[in-house]
Amino acid sequence: MGRNWSKKSRRTAVGAVRRSGAPLALTLAVSLLGLTACGGDGDGGSDSPSASGSGSEQPPQGPDRLGPAPSAVPSVRQWKAVRGPGWQRTDRTRVVPGSDSLRDEAKLLADELKVPVAKGPSRTGDIELKRGEDGGKSPGGKVNGGPESYRLVSSDGKITITGGGDAGVFYGTRTLLQTWRAQGRFAEGTVADAPDRPQRGFSLDIARKNFSADWIKARIREMGDLKLNQLQLHLSDDQAFRVESETHPEIVSDPHLTKAQVRDIVGLAASRHITVIPEIDSPGHLGAVLKAHPELQLRSASGATPRGAIDISKPAAAKLVDELLVEFADLFPGKWAHAGGDEYQALMTENPEQTYPGLAKKAREEFGDKATVQDLATAWLNDRASTLDKQGKIPQVWNDGMHRGGVVKPNKPREVAYWTGREAGERQPSEYLKEGWKIVNLNDEYLYYVLGQPNNFTYPTGRRIYEEWTPAVVRGTDPVPDKWAGRDRILGGRFAVWGDLADAQTTGQVARGIRLPLAATAQKLWDPQRPERSWDDFVKLVDKVD
């Protein structure tokens, strides 16, 4: 991860419909509705996003004029403008939820626009929220996003947002809110929108660098506006363990998040349809745990103690880590959990069996004479994934915890978070995809913001992500073949912040530094096609919608 590469140097390097190489369902939807697509959207950088704004007022839209496309980040995928007055917020504007289940979505939008929530039939000036086939299954709704799809109709001074699910309704409100911030109105017309990838997120290392609960919540609000839906928290590493633990209070560092703060974070994320994914990395990156449990420290034949490496030959090591995984499964109720698996120092030596004879002996005892330390490490990660599976979680692991060959094979179900092509064995993304694994893209060439820029890392730019990267670019700068690039194989991606040199930036500098890259990542996960807006125009738009 941006993590310890004291490892090898990683770098080597209204009218016609827009046809964007999208799936057949999208093309059919466009053909049926005659929707036109709008361009890309913008980026910026601040410590916390603004709650609402008055927008940049546009000239009144006359009945004979076509209004501008929505201003949203990420950009809407289909837009059809028609002649009409459009919508503006007035003193009579209300948000009208079509059911009690949408009341939370209605209240959030109403608070942002500073208007009331109301029951009953909608009227001119209102914003109506509802769920139904128009959002999830109609030609204009289900582009390919299911519950995250939505249809927004601006007609005769009223807005109607129909989502395939609650998330789709929420995303429709984001498009409306951002457009109002940028334009002060919403033109007459219809939006049909849905994400290209189901997993779209941000990964944050809170172990090496402490980030306050308020800072994390500010990012969640920012993520919600960007239609991102996952927040991965790297909870523990060699430097610290940053969350309160009742099963093992002895490992917890100061400062740390209390469980009450975590519940608050998880609750805010849920209100923005964001799943918080906890990561307790093992069998490496456990230095903070081992400080409290030196008896579990891995030792080499010469007595050396590789930092953060737990002795996976000891049953007590597995017991401790499993207890933490089970404890935090309840605290983080989402369907994913991350088991780590990267950079285990025992596998980063030239001859693991000679350097760590205790591990080699245990491997042979458990798996036969041909077994190696790699097999023992694979079995360790299998067991941790199994623990998470029993808790109802989908396990995710780093790609350098997935090894070629060996007596013991990685088990399923699990998803592979691909971050590096410089691990021992250097397995290409295509190798994982050929084997049937599903990948989440955290390509360190584009998506790693490593504090202090150690080991040839450089701070990523939003421009490179916006102009070059797509979910299919998993390693380096080259995409995987099209036959493996679909959303059923590459599930999405996450932009990641790692705190290798924690004091290199303040938390405020981090917030400002990641603002544009995070917006660009959101754009390309929502629609991976080359944006129609230039980068400079994208930046201007981000500033307007924030």
What residue ranges belong to the model's regions?
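Flexible, acidic glycine-rich loops studded with aromatic residues
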Residues: 395-400, 409-546
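Acidic, contiguous N-terminal accessory segments
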Residues: 2-34, 38-167, 175-176, 182-190, ...
